[in-house]
């Protein structure tokens, strides 16, 4: 359309009747290139996974709340450890490791 209003010369009508159904080719004839070096995952997913793995390996601060084994006072600890070392510490908590508060350790209570 040229101008603000359509004119009759610009309107094209297809006035041929369709009496028979014409088949439509739905097959895509696109050829894909070989992708031996590419992975199925997008780059941002791979980068996110690498960041998570790197974060697990580097030490991070973790807050631990536990009880004194003598007087049951709540103790707050902050440790800096990797995920693997933190799991080892938690395993020790489950088995034999106990904490003593500073008052019980000094024997003033």
UniProtKB/Swiss-Prot annotation:
Family: Belongs to the papillomaviridae E7 protein family.
Name recorded for this polypeptide: Protein E7
Subunit structure: Homodimer. Homooligomer. Interacts with host RB1; this interaction induces dissociation of RB1-E2F1 complex thereby disrupting RB1 activity. Interacts with host EP300; this interaction represses EP300 transcriptional activity. Interacts with protein E2; this interaction inhibits E7 oncogenic activity. Interacts with host TMEM173/STING; this interaction impairs the ability of TMEM173/STING to sense cytosolic DNA and promote the production of type I interferon (IFN-alpha and IFN-beta).
Location, primary (coarse class): host cell
Notes on the domains: The E7 terminal domain is an intrinsically disordered domain, whose flexibility and conformational transitions confer target adaptability to the oncoprotein. It allows adaptation to a variety of protein targets and exposes the PEST degradation sequence that regulates its turnover in the cell.
Gene3D superfamilies for the chain: 3.30.160.330
ZnF locations on chain (unnamed): 68-104
Region E7 terminal domain, annotated ranges: 1-47
GO function terms (MF aspect): DNA binding; DNA-binding transcription factor activity; protein domain specific binding; zinc ion binding
Gene Ontology terms: cellular component: host cell cytoplasm; host cell nucleus
Function: Plays a role in viral genome replication by driving entry of quiescent cells into the cell cycle. Stimulation of progression from G1 to S phase allows the virus to efficiently use the cellular DNA replicating machinery to achieve viral genome replication. E7 protein has both transforming and trans-activating activities. Induces the disassembly of the E2F1 transcription factor from RB1, with subsequent transcriptional activation of E2F1-regulated S-phase genes. Interferes with host histone deacetylation mediated by HDAC1 and HDAC2, leading to transcription activation.
Motif, LXCXE motif: chain positions: 26-30
Residue ranges annotated as motif Nuclear export signal: 86-94
PTM (free text): Highly phosphorylated.
Keywords: Activator, DNA-binding, Early protein, G1/S host cell cycle checkpoint dysregulation by virus, Host cytoplasm, Host nucleus, Host-virus interaction, Inhibition of host innate immune response by virus, Inhibition of host interferon signaling pathway by virus, Interferon antiviral system evasion, Metal-binding, Modulation of host cell cycle by virus, Oncogene, Transcription, Transcription regulation, Viral immunoevasion, Zinc, Zinc-finger
Localization per Swiss-Prot or TrEMBL: Host cytoplasm; Host nucleus
GO biological process: DNA-templated transcription; symbiont-mediated perturbation of host cell cycle G1/S transition checkpoint; symbiont-mediated suppression of host innate immune response; symbiont-mediated suppression of host type I interferon-mediated signaling pathway
